[in-house]
Amino acid sequence: MDGFNPRATTVAEYMDGTPKFRTDLYASTCGQLLSHKEYMRVVDMYGLKFTPELKAPEVPMPFMGKYSQEQYAQQLIDEYRAARISPDRVFLQSFSIDDIYFWNRHDADYARQAMFLDSRPDTPEGARQATATMAQLKQSGIRTLSPAFHALLKLDAGNNIVPSDYAVAAKKAGIKLTTWSLERSGPLNKVRASGDFYYSSIAAAIKDDGDIYRVVDVLAQKVGVAGIFSDWPATVSFYANCFNL
């Protein structure tokens, strides 16, 4: 994960921004950033699946007046077609619903498993609106929603972690769910005091690191997510192996 020190007064201090619960052990090896095509070759070599996210541009589009958002979205698909990667192995992601609609119109075979990274429930009003419009969203062509996991969980009257109204509405509408990002929050005994984003809807029930398995269990067994993105694989892999998922 990228990190920075917002209180820095020098370049060195600015770069020394990795949270203490993460490590810079491997940062000194000067790893080389791969292109998307290079990433595809590595993943394909191991016979794995692909989960590319079409990142939001940091420049105005169309870039240089020529390269449009639609061309950007199409280029991603074109590279999978050129490499003859089966659509069944590709799980596209985007925070822009327009990207999902574009793929539905122009690349339906690759769009079937596309995930709309839904940031609407990051606010209470957004969550209410999203929950109320699930049926319309499904009718518009959205098959899989992927919000941060706080959006899929809430606490009941007994302080138990249960599926949120958003999660219940999505499943009722026939929309698949995935979620993110586990293992990004640091020590769980501090998430309530720190106002951690990911645990914001259930922080009152989180006491220590072992509670991560309660979260995973509710997501897997009660919410029924199809997958969980995690910054570290150990927790989800251990759980999946225990329950033969």
UniProtKB/Swiss-Prot annotation:
UniProt entry tagged with the keyword Lipid biosynthesis: no
Recorded superkingdom: Eukaryota
Major place of residence: secreted
GO terms of molecular function: phosphoric diester hydrolase activity
Location in or out of the cell: Secreted
Keywords: Secreted
A cellular-component GO term for this protein: extracellular region
Gene Ontology terms: biological process: lipid metabolic process
Name of the protein: Extracellular protein ARB_04177
Taxonomic lineage from the root: Eukaryota, Fungi, Dikarya, Ascomycota, Pezizomycotina
